[in-house]
């Protein structure tokens, strides 16, 4: 998208980026966002990997605005779903799945179908997946134990969603999603089947075992 915008300028100032989750750290005031100086924080990711590249070659007036990058507030997690609904809902969600437990955003196995945005204690499996994702984490103890996340209902209410599955490590979750017909709480990524318009995109490595289905 950034390459396309560089070649063909468009006004994307109307675009709102709704972030699905963020790591939290405990403080005297309760849970707070992990600092955006951490390369593993979603605040860092969205600014460096999404908004930054998209905005880079556009005139200032045509760029995504800082106030149009939304994160749920750990001081009032429940307000996030209302804020999204009042804005007209999610037009398009880009999803990914945990390799070992099928978590989506930070929703762990067992998440209720009607769950909404909330603070979650991260499962050990989710933390181990993220330990592999971010090389800056040396040991499991360095991975935050809590996060704030949209819920399964928040995701299912999206008008359209795509689940992106990449790499041999995601073969299990791809198989679980393809074998499901509806949301299965023990594998949260199956929420993709609850979205009105949905697709699963896979690379060859993740899809390799599909011949055996």
Say what each PLM segment does.
Residues 81-82, 103-110, 115-117, 173-177, ...:
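A short secondary-structure junction signal
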Residues 1-34, 89-92, 103-124, 164:
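Active-site histidine-anchored catalytic micro-motif
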Residues 1-7, 46-52, 175-178:
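Short, well-ordered amphipathic alpha-helices
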Residues 102-150:
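Class I SAM-dependent methyltransferase SAM-binding "motif I" and its flanking Rossmann-like core
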Residues 10-96:
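Ligand-binding beta-strand-loop-alpha-helix segment within the catalytic cores
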Residues 6-15, 63, 155-158, 192-196:
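Short, conserved loop/helix-junction motifs that constitute active-site signature segments
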Residues 150-153, 157-213:
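ATP/nucleoside-binding phosphotransfer catalytic cores, i.e., glycine-rich phosphate-binding loops
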Residues 69-73, 138-144, 178-180:
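Short, flexible loop segments at the rims of nucleotide/cofactor-binding pockets, characterized by
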């Amino acid at each position: 998208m950034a390459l396309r915008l560089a070649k063909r300028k468009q006004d994307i100032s109307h675009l709102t980026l709704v972030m699905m989750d963020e790591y939290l750290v405990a403080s005297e005031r309760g849970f707070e966002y992990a600092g955006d100086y951490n390369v593993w924080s979603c605040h860092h990711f969205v600014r460096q990997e999404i908004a930054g590249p998209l905005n880079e070659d556009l005139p200032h007036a045509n760029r995504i605005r800082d106030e149009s990058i939304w994160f749920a507030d750990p001081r009032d997690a429940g307000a996030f779903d209302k804020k999204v609904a009042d804005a007209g809902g999610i037009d398009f969600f880009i999803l990914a799945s945990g390799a070992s437990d099928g978590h989506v955003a930070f929703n762990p196995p067992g998440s209720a179908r009607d769950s909404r945005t909330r603070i979650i204690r991260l499962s050990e499996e989710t933390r181990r997946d993220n330990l592999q994702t971010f090389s800056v984490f040396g040991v499991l103890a360095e991975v935050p134990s809590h996060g704030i996340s949209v819920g399964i209902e928040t995701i299912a209410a999206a008008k359209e969603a795509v689940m992106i599955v990449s790499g041999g490590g995601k073969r299990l979750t791809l198989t679980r999603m393809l074998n499901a017909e509806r949301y299965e709480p023990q594998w949260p990524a199956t929420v993709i089947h609850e979205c009105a318009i949905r697709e699963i995109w896979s690379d060859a490595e993740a899809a390799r075992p599909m011949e055996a289905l």
